[in-house]
């Protein structure tokens, strides 16, 4: 799956066409159905405006919201998105009470002069995800013929398909892979994601550094395996570093996080040497007597080990210097997972110092890519998203891409 040869919205002629766009409007709502964070809607505006500015007959927007489990549930209606979308676009938006069917088709076919239509939640139909769970966790599969019918219903609403929902690209859902139109192109959000991940995974400027943090090694096994073949330097930090320290260096880690399942793969990191990959691990630690923001703190080093009854929740100053050296040497930096428990101020220093170093690097021309999830939360917490080359919007999707997996929503796009 090449990331760099996919058709993009700027490659297609939209004039006079019904443009069907899969967006990600899965936004948080409060109890009064008011949007508490509009970032995802803001992110889709350039793609929608491009279609309107280039003469689209109509722009038809489809999205999911929450997990209604294949049934209509007013709690998850997309209707509350309409006022915010109208405000950001500066024009009226028609809301369709369903996402397929004759009523929706007639709304879409009657639209003209760049009308914008928002369809109701795709996941009100079991055919979108292909299955649903009841409250006891029992799974029901969607009927194959009905899934086909649903996909035909979506296809009937457009002449050109644009996918701008990178965060759902790892899901083979009907709206991601089942729209059967001759031209299927990436929107601006999707294109930016693909361009930056191609820069890292297909043609990185070297030296290429990956910083992998977070808690569990077992969550990152495939990621480590895939990246060991691509990077020049690998920093392993955060909670998962303690499993490496215990297994590879036999260092006492007290009550620090130890991942039994992940421990079995640490020896494979000895392969790093064979692959000429420099492996950087922390060498000193900020410790705590309990997992709590108000815990008593201490310090430990590799020489002393972490005493019984204490756990490492952040790295110390010497480790930060090692990370900074690796960042200074690199030209391409990919960061996935924090360097400590950044949610607690006492243990946020390692993550903050690493962030400061990559922001500085970016200012000096390095390519810095933040791979979604907790690390994107860190960038947002310190308000530096616009000071980095790219902060991914897809936690699960970016992780699967970095693991070397094909993303169904990307595979489904037309090639140039």
UniProtKB/Swiss-Prot annotation:
Necessary cofactors: Mg(2+)
Known catalytic reactions: (2R)-3-phosphoglycerate + ATP = (2R)-3-phospho-glyceroyl phosphate + ADP
Pathway: Carbohydrate degradation; glycolysis; pyruvate from D-glyceraldehyde 3-phosphate: step 2/5
GO biological process: gluconeogenesis; glycolytic process
Protein residues bound to ATP: 215, 220, 239, 312, 343, 374-375
Positions annotated to bind Mg(2+): 215, 219, 374
Keyword Zinc-finger annotated: no
GO cellular component: cytosol; mitochondrion
UniProt binding sites for CDP: 214, 219, 238, 337, 339, 342
Binding site for (2R)-3-phosphoglycerate: 23-26, 39-40, 63-64, 66-67, 122-123, 170-171
Matching PROSITE patterns: PGLYCERATE_KINASE
Record key words, sorted: ATP-binding, Cytoplasm, Glycolysis, Kinase, Magnesium, Metal-binding, Mitochondrion, Nucleotide-binding, Transferase
Predominant location category: cytoplasm
Assembly and oligomerization: Monomer.
Function: Catalyzes one of the two ATP producing reactions in the glycolytic pathway via the reversible conversion of 1,3-diphosphoglycerate to 3-phosphoglycerate. Both L- and D- forms of purine and pyrimidine nucleotides can be used as substrates, but the activity is much lower on pyrimidines. Negatively regulates the biosynthesis of acetyl-CoA from pyruvate in the mitochondrion.
Name of the protein in question: Phosphoglycerate kinase
Source species of the chain: Hypocrea jecorina
Annotated gene: pgk1
């Amino acid at each position: 799956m090449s990331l760099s040869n996919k058709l993009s919205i700027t490659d297609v002629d939209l004039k006079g066409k019904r443009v069907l766009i899969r967006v990600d409007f899965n936004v948080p709502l409060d109890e009064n159905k008011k949007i508490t964070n509009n970032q995802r809607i803001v992110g889709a505006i350039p793609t929608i405006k491009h279609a309107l500015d280039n003469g689209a007959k109509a722009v038809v927007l489809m999205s999911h919201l929450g997990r209604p489990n294949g049934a209509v549930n007013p709690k998850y209606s997309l209707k509350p998105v309409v006022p915010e979308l109208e405000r950001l676009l500066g024009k009226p938006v028609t809301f369709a009470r369903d996402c397929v069917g004759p009523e929706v088709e007639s709304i879409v076919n009657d639209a003209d002069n760049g009308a914008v239509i928002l369809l109701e939640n795709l996941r009100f139909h079991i055919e979108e995800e292909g299955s649903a769970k009841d409250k006891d966790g029992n799974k029901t599969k969607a009927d194959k013929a009905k899934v086909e019918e649903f996909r035909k219903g979506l296809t009937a609403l457009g002449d050109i398909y644009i996918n701008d929902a990178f965060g759902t690209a790892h899901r083979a859902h009907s709206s991601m892979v089942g729209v059967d139109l001759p031209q299927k192109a990436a929107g601006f959000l999707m294109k930016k994601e693909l361009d930056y991940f191609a820069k890292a995974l297909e043609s990185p400027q070297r030296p290429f550094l990956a910083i992998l943090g977070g808690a569990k090694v077992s969550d990152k096994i495939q990621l480590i395996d895939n990246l060991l073949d691509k990077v020049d330097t690998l920093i392993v930090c955060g909670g998962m570093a303690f499993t490496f320290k215990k297994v590879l260096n036999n260092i006492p880690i007290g009550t620090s996080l130890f991942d039994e399942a992940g421990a079995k793969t640490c020896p494979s990191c000895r392969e790093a040497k064979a692959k000429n990959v420099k492996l950087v691990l922390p060498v000193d630690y900020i410790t705590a007597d309990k997992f709590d923001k108000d815990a008593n703190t201490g310090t430990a080093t590799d020489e002393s080990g972490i005493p019984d009854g204490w756990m490492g929740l952040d790295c110390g100053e010497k480790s930060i210097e090692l990370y900074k050296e690796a960042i200074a040497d690199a030209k391409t930096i990919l960061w996935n997972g924090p360097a400590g428990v950044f949610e607690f101020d006492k243990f946020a220093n390692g993550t903050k110092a690493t962030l400061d170093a990559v922001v500085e690097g970016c200012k000096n021309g390095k390519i810095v890519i933040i791979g979604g999830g907790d690390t994107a939360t860190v960038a947002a917490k310190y308000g530096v998203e616009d000071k980095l080359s790219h902060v991914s919007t897809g936690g699960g999707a970016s992780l699967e891409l970095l693991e070397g997996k094909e993303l169904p929503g990307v595979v489904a796009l037309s090639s140039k």
